[in-house]
Design a protein with these regions (language model features):
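N-terminal beta1-alpha1-beta2 module of alpha/beta enzyme domains
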Residues: 1-67
Length: 70
C-alpha cells in the first residue's frame, strides 16, 4: 500500500495569517518523507475564489527538489 500526504493551503478563518498558514503547510510537506509517506499531493480549489497555492505544479516541483524519493 502506498500512503501519501495532502497539503491543502487553506487558511480561511481560524485567526491565522496567510503567511503562517503557508509556512506551516511547507513544514508539513517537509515532514512527509521522514515520516514514511511516499507522495505529496496538492489541491486545486476549482469551485472557490480562495486559494493560497495557485500553481500546484510549482508547489510539487518545489518538494521534488527538497526530497530524495518523493
Amino acid at each position: 500500500m502506498h500512503v501519501g500526504m495532502g497539503v491543502i493551503f487553506q487558511g480561511e478563518g481560524g485567526g491565522r495569517t496567510d503567511r503562517n498558514v503557508y509556512r506551516n503547510e511547507l513544514r508539513f510537506g517537509d515532514l512527509a518523507e521522514p515520516l514514511g509517506f511516499e507522495s505529496i499531493w496538492g489541491v486545486e480549489h476549482h469551485f472557490t475564489d480562495y486559494t493560497m497555492c495557485p500553481d500546484v505544479l510549482q508547489y510539487l516541483t518545489y518538494f521534488a527538489g527538497r526530497t530524495e524519493r518523493i
